[in-house]
């Protein structure tokens, strides 16, 4: 469904009117910061009082202090500082916030106004240009003529530099969008030229990054939602400029909106795969506020590589695709056939939820950090490290190259079979068979490891065993206990509804793990179904998740 537009810039309930999306995009980011706030007072009030909290770090600068002349507590904090991630918070504070923002921008300009390897890097520049363009009107309303001239020059210079960047191709579309929005707030020929340059780059990348089913090319659901915010902002900015939006822009917005609905699970949060986090319902609602009458959510996203199973009080989403390759894989995870399961509105089964905000914790991108199979002490893929990672980025390599998914729906439920070669380095293929029984409100699963090319008589040769486990990572708000039989596991979520996980594994354990929220680790648990596998023979573990009585 196409985005609905209006010349009226006032705020009303969805669908949004033109002129509202810029503020909604900024407002959603403000909401994200408020969620991260530890002190109970709004972030803008903290900044006005001289305390900056960004990405888990705290810097006390005083009411008139200069954060750009003080060492940041961490690199993550410094990136967020130079991206101006604090700017939406100050814009939300009204006149006082805008005046403080102008002073902080002057502090930044004095030290970093000319090119700098860190501050002008793609990871800082793209969001900084976006924030400056979105906040330009509010800042100009409080600025002097000199401050407005400086702000205009900042947007023009940085916007032009943005379209010239050739690094980080996985963010090329987002850079084109930010540059075009910057052009929309600049008057005259400079603005028109930047718009034309930005739209030209946009046209090159839009259909490469937004897949036919609305998924993002990185396979991260969160990346798709954040891109949707950017495209809505771009659509609004072009309209305010009097420029028509490209058809490809409207099409991408429609597709991303459909995918956002698909990836939103029954607990209201987003599914967390491939470096994306389970963002909050309010953030999702803001992304979809432009059109509240969208199409019925799909049960499959074949281009993105995901399947969803819904029946009774159970909802399952499964990763059924190959990991992205090359630069698109800098946030990808080696977790083929991973599951997230929502039971009666409680997200019980998830993954560790790694995202780039977790900084260097790349071990959580490996197979044993998700609800899937692990073999030995290896992984179905790995991120680059050392010199290659410094040169190229933390690309994911040696991942699954062949992944097949077959689905069958009938009156009684849904069958889903996933087969992949992610464990080919140990000579095994993993097959995960799932059946969601809508009648009995249960999910049955079978995880099999089979030899890729078993030679005749191999089973009679020397016996070599590898540890084999099926892991179910629990949400931090879920708890689990093992029954007296030593096998069955009772899992309960916030609603206190119990679910039995029964299985035929050799051994069962509940082990500690971590779950990341905005890059910060929370304590969580995982249920580990253990067995052993002979690569020449194979092995399987069967399990069933069913609602507990009473």
Q: Language-model features: where?
A:
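Asp/Glu-centered strand-loop micro-motifs enriched in Gly/Pro and often flanked by an aromatic residue
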Residues: 54-78, 91-93
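Residues that flank catalytic or metal-binding motifs in active/ligand-binding sites
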Residues: 82, 305, 337, 369, ...
């Amino acid at each position: 469904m196409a985005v609905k537009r209006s010349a009226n810039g006032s705020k009303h309930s969805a669908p949004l009117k033109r002129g509202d999306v810029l503020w909604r995009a900024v407002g959603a980011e403000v909401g994200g910061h408020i969620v991260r706030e530890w002190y109970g007072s709004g972030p803008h009030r903290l900044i006005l009082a001289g305390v900056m909290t960004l990405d888990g770090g705290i810097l006390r600068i005083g009411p008139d202090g200069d954060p750009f002349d003080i060492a940041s507590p961490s690199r993550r904090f410094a990136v967020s500082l130079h991206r101006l991630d604090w700017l939406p918070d100050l814009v939300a504070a009204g006149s006082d916030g805008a005046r403080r923002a102008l002073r902080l921008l002057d502090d930044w300009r004095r030290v970093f106004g000319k090119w700098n390897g860190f501050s002008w890097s793609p990871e800082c520049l793209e969001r900084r240009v976006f924030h400056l363009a979105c906040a330009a009107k509010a800042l100009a309303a409080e600025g002097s003529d000199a401050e407005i001239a400086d702000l205009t020059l900042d947007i023009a210079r940085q916007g032009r530099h943005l379209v010239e960047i050739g690094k980080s191709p996985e963010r090329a579309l987002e850079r084109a969008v930010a540059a075009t929005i910057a052009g929309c707030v600049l008057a005259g020929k400079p603005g028109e030229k930047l718009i034309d340059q930005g739209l030209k780059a946009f046209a090159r990348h839009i259909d490469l990054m937004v897949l036919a089913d609305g998924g993002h090319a990185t396979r991260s659901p969160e990346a798709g939602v954040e891109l949707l915010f950017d495209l809505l902002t771009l659509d609004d900015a072009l309209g305010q400029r009097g420029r028509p939006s490209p058809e490809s822009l409207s099409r991408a917005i429609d597709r991303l909106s459909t995918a956002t609905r698909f990836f939103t699970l029954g607990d209201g949060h987003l599914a967390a795969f491939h470096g994306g986090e389970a963002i909050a319902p309010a953030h999702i609602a803001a992304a979809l506020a432009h059109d509240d009458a969208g199409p019925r959510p799909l049960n499959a996203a074949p281009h993105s590589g995901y399947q969803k199973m819904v029946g009774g009080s159970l909802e399952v989403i499964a990763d059924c695709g190959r990991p992205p390759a090359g630069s698109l894989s800098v946030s990808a995870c080696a977790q083929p056939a991973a599951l997230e399961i929502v039971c009666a509105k409680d997200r019980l089964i998830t993954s560790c939820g790694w995202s780039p905000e977790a900084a260097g914790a790349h071990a959580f991108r490996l197979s044993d950090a998700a609800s899937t199979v692990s073999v030995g002490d290896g992984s179905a893929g790995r991120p680059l490290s050392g010199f290659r990672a410094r040169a190229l980025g933390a690309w994911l390599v040696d991942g699954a190259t062949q992944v097949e998914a077959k689905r069958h729906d009938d009156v009684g439920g849904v069958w889903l079979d996933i087969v992949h070669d992610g464990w080919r380095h140990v000579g095994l293929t993993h097959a995960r068979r799932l059946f969601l029984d809508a009648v009995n409100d249960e999910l049955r699963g079978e995880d099999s490891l089979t030899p890729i090319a078993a030679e005749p008589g191999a089973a009679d040769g020397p016996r070599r065993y590898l540890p084999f486990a099926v892991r179910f990572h629990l949400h931090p708000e879920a708890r689990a206990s093992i029954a007296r039989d030593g096998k069955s596991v009772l899992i309960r979520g916030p609603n206190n509804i119990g679910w039995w996980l029964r299985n035929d594994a050799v051994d069962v354990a509940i082990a500690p793990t971590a779950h990341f929220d905005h890059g910060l680790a929370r304590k969580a648990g995982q249920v580990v179904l253990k067995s052993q596998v002979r690569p020449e023979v194979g092995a399987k573990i069967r399990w069933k998740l069913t609602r507990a009585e009473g």
